[in-house]
Amino acid sequence: MLIWVGLTNNELTGLNHTGVLNIAPTRGQLRAFQGASLLFTADSVKVSPGLVLVAAGKRYQASAPVVFKSDCGRFQITSLRRAGIAQPVYEGNLRVHSASRSLRLSLELSLDSYMQGVLAAEMPASYHAEALKGQALCARTYALRPRLPHDQDLVNVCDSYLCCQYFAGHGASLDPRIKAAIEGTAGQVLVHDEKPILALFSSNAGGHTENYENCFSDPVTGAFPPPPLPYLKGVPEGNYPGLKAPVGSEQFLAYLYSNSGLGTKLCADNWSPKFHFHHRITADSLEAHLHHNIEKLMDDRESAPYVIPPAGSGRGRFGHIKRFQVLKRGVSGVAIELAIETNLGQWRVQKELLIRKVFANPDAGIKRLNSARIFFQQKYDKLGLLAGLEVSGLGFGHGVGFQQQGAQGLALAGMNYKQILSHYFPGARIAQY
């Protein structure tokens, strides 16, 4: 099976490339086709917006998408950067076309070749074989049903973890453990009602996974919360010895955080450093940065509806921060509505990702919080004014569906990949596509 993958820009934020592309095969030559016609054969090519091609000292003006094929089946785009890879290598055929004064790149390759790149980027090859197999099924299924449709982009998926799943190209060689995971699950996908499921995954759920509808908007309508998906329900990652608080409460999060020393006796993902995090932020630093974060969210068309200012204030002054309060939590304890009390009224922020972004703070080294499964300790001075904030949290990522480090913990405890997937996607089953 062949699929098309959209290659995003260096920031992984969009499909449009505004600079000059340098494309070269890893060995042999590169052939450029427009339709069925061969334009040229060369050692390398530079492509500028407007589909201006320069190769072997000659200039070509293309009027339609150009497809590049290399003799060896591999090529580099030396102007692209991916995390940890200066010049990613790709297998397959590359299609380049114009799009509003920029270029768009899409890669045609086999589904298995795509999965090799995804698994290498998403999960360490050193993980247990059964955890790797579980990730392989998630990657294969997600390629068939991404959360956000890319039909208008003429691709099946994109390569960005900000939108789909991370595909950073291909290394010089494929780790045999990744190859074994792909081959050991050949043709297998996860289905519900005989259709591929939305196989979401994240790094670490912090002791309990979360319901889909508490973390994501509807991909078509944008509505939040969206209709629930029966196989994306939050599940516990342990037996929680000695727990007295209700699961999902703030006290539950504090219990997990304070008992992290119990290791896997507590839960399957507790072995990882990503299980919990802690930040201290001074009041001065909060005042300096938080209102700017709110402004950025309100300036963004997609996030603006989920930032609610005090009644009657419109987009007026933010005010001085008095306290933070989580108004609504999901089944795992994830914050899905946050109140920020100021002297000018109460601001509310909805959705876990936006709540994480609100706390971006260069002074504290925070780009965004690792997760929104958070609780606070707020400190006040003698005048009763906020002096500082401590944010404690659990997990890394949205925590919906398959969680990689929990899967590793379950595999080490003796579960096979089918049992692991049944745990994370209740009601789904494995089928041949």
Where would I find each of the regions flagged by the language model?
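Conserved, single-site charged/polar hotspot
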Residues: 1-433
